[in-house]
């Protein structure tokens, strides 16, 4: 399971670095609420579908490398506003046939390094702005 967590995290990190500036330019700096609403609607649909999935029978130990990469890719897509990272990773893990409890576990274990890493990158990227603001 640890190897799959690292593989999913690595995939998220690589794709996230490529998507970050594009997503910020398209969705965040255009001052429109529409992308957020679309993302939230998409998340609601995915979560609704998740409640209907009943093919979960496998344990996390049976998760393949390809499935771990898919989970990492989906998590990177959640960089878009309004899209739930945990909802998407839970959904794709369920789609892989993993038991619901273990899908939640994997999703939240994956969240810890992802969120800490994103916070670190944002802090380093915006450090100049942070120090300038606090100096006022």
Tell where the protein language model's regions lie, with residue ranges.
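Multi-pass membrane proteins that catalyze or facilitate reactions on polyprenyl-/lipid-phosphate substrates
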Residues: 1-136
